[in-house]
């Protein structure tokens, strides 16, 4: 007997609230933090999110009979209270994998964080976490190189990498920009970096910057005997211009380029990552605009989701905040999404904000980049928090040295090596940080001056987006 079509409107929970459902290994799972309008039951709010992010619409439609709606629909299978919040709750939703184009992060986000975020029944909605099934991960190319390959390319092992953003980030001519790059690299840094908003402005066209940077790197490598690099930002107004800049960096024999993945978009980022893999280029990723999306504790997308999506889309390095610097991010939350960038399997751990087990299979890892308001006094904590597979970037903490950028770079290099040596000797570098740094400063006038210069600089503000734990 054929199905009967009943026109009209019915409650979402009649179809999309399925508390008896057991998620499949192939399902894509999502955790949303929901705050509904007053008087709307939690089950109806959660079911509405499942419906509007999958197969649902506001009215029953006859064309539902032309497909197997029960197979394709998203299902809210669990609701949990948010600790310490009387209004919000977690909705756990399972989506069949066939709802998404293979390997397309753009398509996944269009469904999960599309029109549903403007739904009137919701006051706030936040995507807290996604469990990508291994079947989907295998369709994504991921990082173009990964941690091990990058270390081999740069010939750097056994410690975090050191970098800095060129300052002032806007206004320098190409030649003066190259001079600052040279000073930093000869002083001891591994990388220097374009800031996120340096593209091709009237004061410095991109070709000019690329050429002077390439010359600076060549001189610094000859002087130090080390492999050096600079993150050349190829983010552009069109994909064609982006690839033109990437090709020119390759012609100059540069090891690494950079992309602003949120403002540039996931489609552009995935394409650029594939280009980097095919052309032997490392890819540094900046997260400009992320806080607009992830900082509000009740609305938006948590950064752990953006970090997971970036690993799938492709990038070899990603900014993650610092814990100790000027940018938002507490220690446990930051460690949670650093794990998602680097590990092959990350277990559910609410104390770090991870709502699901996440199996990454054999996908390469991504370097976590600590950048934003850090200086030499932060070095012991940074080494302890981020470990070796990280890039520690000191912008003002390099250029602000009273003796200039080369001295600032030297101070950071000495501090880093002192902390790594102390850690390897079994010392508790966070507890013994002052002794370790002061001892190293006795043999490095650059470090001694840096320690004196920044001894009073702290960024002691409470975190806005805190973990929801009891």
UniProtKB/Swiss-Prot annotation:
Q: Which Pfam families match?
A: RuBisCO_large, RuBisCO_large_N
Query: Where is this protein localized, as stated in its record?
Result: Carboxysome
Q: Where is this site: Transition state stabilizer?
A: 326
What Gene Ontology terms describe what this protein does at the molecular function level? magnesium ion binding; monooxygenase activity; ribulose-bisphosphate carboxylase activity
Cofactor names: Mg(2+)
Q: Which UniProt keywords apply?
A: Bacterial microcompartment, Calvin cycle, Carbon dioxide fixation, Carboxysome, Lyase, Magnesium, Metal-binding, Monooxygenase, Oxidoreductase, Photorespiration, Photosynthesis
Sorted alphabetically, the Gene Ontology BP terms of this entry are: photorespiration; reductive pentose-phosphate cycle
* Positions of modified residues (N6-carboxylysine): 193
Where is it mainly found?
A: other
The record's catalysed reaction(s) read: 2 (2R)-3-phosphoglycerate + 2 H(+) = D-ribulose 1,5-bisphosphate + CO2 + H2O; D-ribulose 1,5-bisphosphate + O2 = 2-phosphoglycolate + (2R)-3-phosphoglycerate + 2 H(+)
Q: SUPFAM superfamilies, alphabetically? A: RuBisCo, C-terminal domain, RuBisCO, large subunit, small (N-terminal) domain
Q: Which residues bind Mg(2+)?
A: 193, 195-196
Its GO CC terms?
carboxysome
**What EC number(s) has UniProt assigned to this enzyme?**
4.1.1.39
The protein's superkingdom reads Bacteria
Q: Where is the active site?
A: 167, 286
InterPro entries tied to this protein: RuBisCO, RuBisCo_large_chain_AS, RuBisCO_lsu_C, RuBisCO_lsu_C_sf, RuBisCO_lsu_fd_N, RuBisCO_lsu_N_sf, RuBisCO_lsuI
Q: Quaternary state and partners of this protein?
A: Heterohexadecamer of 8 large chains and 8 small chains.
The record's similarity note reads: Belongs to the RuBisCO large chain family. Type I subfamily.
Q: What else is known?
A: The basic functional RuBisCO is composed of a large chain homodimer in a 'head-to-tail' conformation. In form I RuBisCO this homodimer is arranged in a barrel-like tetramer with the small subunits forming a tetrameric 'cap' on each end of the 'barrel'.
Q: What does this protein do?
A: RuBisCO catalyzes two reactions: the carboxylation of D-ribulose 1,5-bisphosphate, the primary event in carbon dioxide fixation, as well as the oxidative fragmentation of the pentose substrate in the photorespiration process. Both reactions occur simultaneously and in competition at the same active site.
Q: What protein name applies here?
A: Ribulose bisphosphate carboxylase large chain
Source taxonomy:
Bacteria, Bacillati, Cyanobacteriota, Cyanophyceae, Synechococcales
């Amino acid at each position: 007997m054929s199905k009967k079509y009943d026109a009209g409107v019915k409650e979402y929970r009649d179809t999309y609230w399925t508390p008896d459902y057991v998620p499949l290994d192939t399902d894509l799972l999502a955790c949303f933090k929901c705050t509904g309008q007053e008087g709307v039951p939690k089950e109806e709010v959660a079911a509405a999110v499942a419906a509007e992010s999958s197969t649902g619409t506001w009215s029953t439609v006859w064309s539902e009979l032309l497909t197997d709606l029960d197979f394709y629909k998203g299902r809210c299978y669990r609701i949990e209270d948010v600790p310490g919040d009387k209004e919000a709750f977690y909705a756990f939703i399972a989506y069949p994998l066939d709802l998404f184009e293979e390997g397309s992060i753009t398509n996944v986000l269009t469904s999960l964080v599309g029109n549903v975020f403007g739904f009137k029944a919701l006051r706030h909605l936040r995507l807290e976490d996604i469990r990508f099934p291994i079947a989907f991960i295998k369709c994504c190319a991921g990082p173009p190189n990964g941690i091990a390959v990058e270390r081999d390319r740069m010939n750097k092992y056994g410690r975090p990498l050191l970098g800095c953003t060129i300052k002032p980030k806007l206004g320098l001519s190409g030649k003066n920009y190259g001079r600052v790059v040279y000073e930093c690299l000869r002083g001891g840094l591994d990388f220097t970096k374009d800031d996120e908003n340096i593209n091709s402005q009237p004061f410095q066209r991109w070709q000019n910057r690329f050429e002077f940077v390439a010359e600076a790197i060549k001189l610094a490598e000859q002087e130090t005997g080390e492999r050096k690099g600079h993150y050349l930002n190829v983010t552009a107004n069109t994909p064609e211009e982006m690839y033109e800049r990437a090709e020119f960096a390759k012609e100059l024999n540069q090891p690494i380029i950079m992309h602003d993945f949120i403002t540039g978009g996931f489609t552009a980022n995935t394409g650029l990552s594939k280009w980097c893999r095919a052309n032997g280029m490392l890819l540094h990723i900046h997260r400009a605009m992320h806080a607009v999306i992830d900082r509000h504790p009740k609305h938006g997308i948590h950064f752990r989701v953006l970090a997971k999506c970036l690993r799938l889309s492709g990038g070899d390095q990603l900014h993650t905040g610092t814990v100790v610097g000027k940018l938002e991010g507490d220690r446990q939350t930051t460690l949670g999404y650093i794990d998602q960038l680097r590990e092959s399997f990350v277990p559910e751990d609410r104390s770090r904000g991870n709502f699901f087990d996440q199996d990454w299979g054999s996908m390469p890892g991504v370097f976590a980049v600590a950048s934003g308001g850090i200086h030499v006094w932060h070095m012991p904590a940074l080494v302890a928090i981020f470990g070796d597979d990280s890039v520690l970037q000191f912008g003002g903490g390099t250029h602000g040295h009273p003796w200039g950028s080369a001295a600032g770079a030297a101070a950071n290099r000495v501090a880093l090596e002192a902390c790594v040596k102390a850690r390897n000797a079994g010392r508790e570098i966070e507890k013994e940080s002052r002794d370790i740094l002061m001892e190293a400063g006795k043999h490095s006038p650059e470090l001694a001056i840096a320690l004196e210069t920044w001894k009073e600089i702290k960024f002691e503000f409470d975190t806005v987006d805190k973990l929801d734990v009891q």
